[in-house]
C-alpha cells in the first residue's frame, strides 16, 4: 500500500472529496484511496482516526495528516513543486489563491440549493435568486480568468488548484442545466474531458447507493 492515503466519501455527491482527489491526482503522488461513508456513528468513528475534523477529504502523507482542502492543496504544492499546482507568476499565484479562497468560504446558496449529484439530470430546474447571484459571481470569475490567461483552464494551459476547486461547480452546472455563456460552457467541457475527471465521473455513475434526500429538486 502506498504511504500516501486520501480519505474521501461518495464520488457522486461529495464535492469536497472531488476537490481533494483532483489535487492529489494533479500532484502526481502515488496514493491509496480510502472511501468511507459519513452518515453513521461507526463511519464517523472510523473517519476520526483518519481526519481530526471528521470531514473529507483528509490526506495522510509520510505520517503527516492534512484535513482541509485548501491546506491539502498548499501542502501538495510544497511537496510536489514540479506539478505547478499554483501559477509560477507571483501576481497570478495571488489571484489563484484568492479565487480558491472565495470558493472555499463562499457560495453557500449554490451549495445548499444545487448539491452535487453527478448521476442526476434535473430538467427545467428553477434556480433560486440567491443561488443565481452565486452563479453570476462564479461565471464572472471564470470569464475574467479565461480572458486574462487565455485558457483552456482558469490560469492557462495547465490545470491548477483553482480548476480543482471549481470542478464540482462544473458538475453542478451540468446536472441542473444552468444557462452559461459559450466561453463558460466551453470551460466546463474542457474540465470534464480531462482524464482525471472522466475517471471520477465513471466511478460516480457506478456507485450503487443513492441518498434519497439529495435526489429531489429543491
What are these regions (language model features)?
Residues 1-128:
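GST-like domain detector, emphasizing the conserved glutathione-binding G-site
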Residues 42-44, 192, 210-211:
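Short Asp/Glu-rich motifs
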Residues 6-8, 31-34, 157, 174-175, ...:
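Short, contiguous strand/loop micro-motifs
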Residues 103, 107-195:
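GST-like fold's C-terminal all-alpha helical module
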Residues 204-218:
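Acidic/histidine-enriched, glycine/proline-rich intrinsically disordered or flexible terminal extensions
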Residues 49, 193, 202:
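Phosphate-coordinating loops and pocket residues in cytosolic domains that bind phosphorylated ligands
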Residues 37-39, 187, 205:
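Conserved beta-strand edge residues that scaffold enzyme active sites
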Residues 15-16, 21, 67, 86, ...:
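Tryptophan-centric aromatic hotspots in well-structured domains and transmembrane helices
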Amino acid at each position: 500500500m502506498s504511504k500516501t492515503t486520501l480519505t474521501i466519501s461518495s464520488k457522486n455527491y461529495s464535492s469536497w472529496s472531488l476537490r481533494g482527489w483532483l489535487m492529489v491526482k494533479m500532484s502526481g503522488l502515488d496514493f491509496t484511496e480510502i472511501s468511507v461513508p459519513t452518515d453513521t456513528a461507526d463511519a464517523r468513528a472510523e473517519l476520526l482516526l483518519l481526519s481530526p475534523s471528521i470531514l473529507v477529504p483528509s490526506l495522510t502523507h509520510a505520517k503527516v495528516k492534512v484535513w482541509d482542502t485548501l491546506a491539502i492543496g498548499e501542502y501538495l504544492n510544497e511537496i510536489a513543486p514540479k506539478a505547478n499546482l499554483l501559477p509560477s507568476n507571483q501576481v497570478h499565484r495571488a489571484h489563484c489563491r484568492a479565487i480558491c479562497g472565495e470558493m472555499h468560504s463562499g457560495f453557500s446558496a449554490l451549495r445548499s440549493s444545487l448539491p452535487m449529484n453527478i448521476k442526476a439530470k434535473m430538467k427545467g430546474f428553477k434556480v433560486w435568486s440567491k443561488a443565481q447571484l452565486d452563479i453570476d459571481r462564479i461565471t464572472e470569475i471564470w470569464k475574467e480568468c479565461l480572458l486574462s490567461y487565455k485558457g483552456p483552464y482558469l490560469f492557462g494551459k495547465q490545470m491548477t488548484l483553482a480548476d480543482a476547486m471549481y470542478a464540482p461547480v462544473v458538475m453542478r452546472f451540468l446536472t441542473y442545466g444552468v444557462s452559461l455563456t459559450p466561453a463558460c460552457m466551453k470551460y466546463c467541457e474542457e474540465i470534464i474531458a480531462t482524464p482525471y475527471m472522466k475517471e471520477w465521473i465513471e466511478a460516480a455513475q457506478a456507485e450503487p447507493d443513492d441518498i434519497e434526500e439529495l435526489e429531489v429538486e429543491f
